[in-house]
Amino acid sequence: MKFIFGLGNIGAEYDQTRHNIGFMAVDAFATANHMSFSPSKQFALVAKTIIGGESVMLVKPTTYMNDSGKAVRAILDYYDGDVDDVLVLVDDMDLPFGKMRFRAKGSAGGHNGLKSIMTHTGSQTFLRLKFGLGHPVHEQNVVVNYVLGKFTAAEKPDIDAMLDRSTQAIADWIQGATAPELSNRYNG
């Protein structure tokens, strides 16, 4: 089974915020594939389907961003999954706005959701699809307000285009594209 974890925060106040781009990407993929989410006992909302003969599970952790690893670990344990079959969709302030980047391994880069996943899985070698938010000034209160802020109307066309590209990128991964192939096709 392929597991696609979109990272974000649960609650209407976080809907359409920059930090929730992972949720937005997994929602876009679900919509494109006529999938709907339901609650699970593994601290998440899940949607399941089969694409090209491959079982696929979309996951939105309900633990809040900074404890996403709890849901990842619970899902992998319950479904006897492995980090090799995981794709994490996550925001990245160090990427220019509107760019996407696949990364097969590495540190959390200061992202608490990724840090939680690494802590709970004991691994840094899971595939991530990072969505560029751009970076405001490096003052902590400005950064927090930026990531928890909603996308502007001017940003919406770029976000929609990025979500469309991510839907195709996720489909390519499900169909067996390797990390280097995905990087060559989608990293911008």
From Swiss-Prot:
Active site: H19
Site (Discriminates between blocked and unblocked aminoacyl-tRNA): N9
Its biological purpose: Hydrolyzes ribosome-free peptidyl-tRNAs (with 1 or more amino acids incorporated), which drop off the ribosome during protein synthesis, or as a result of ribosome stalling. Catalyzes the release of premature peptidyl moieties from peptidyl-tRNA molecules trapped in stalled 50S ribosomal subunits, and thus maintains levels of free tRNAs and 50S ribosomes.
Keyword Isomerase: no
This protein's UniProt keywords: Cytoplasm, Hydrolase, RNA-binding, tRNA-binding
Entry GO terms, CC: cytoplasm
Binding residues for tRNA: Y14, Y64, N66, N112
Compartments in which it is found: Cytoplasm
Protein name per its UniProtKB record: Peptidyl-tRNA hydrolase
SUPFAM superfamilies: Peptidyl-tRNA hydrolase-like
Domain of life of the native organism: Bacteria
GO annotation terms (biological process): protein quality control for misfolded or incompletely synthesized proteins; rescue of stalled ribosome
Database matches in PANTHER family: PEPTIDYL-TRNA HYDROLASE
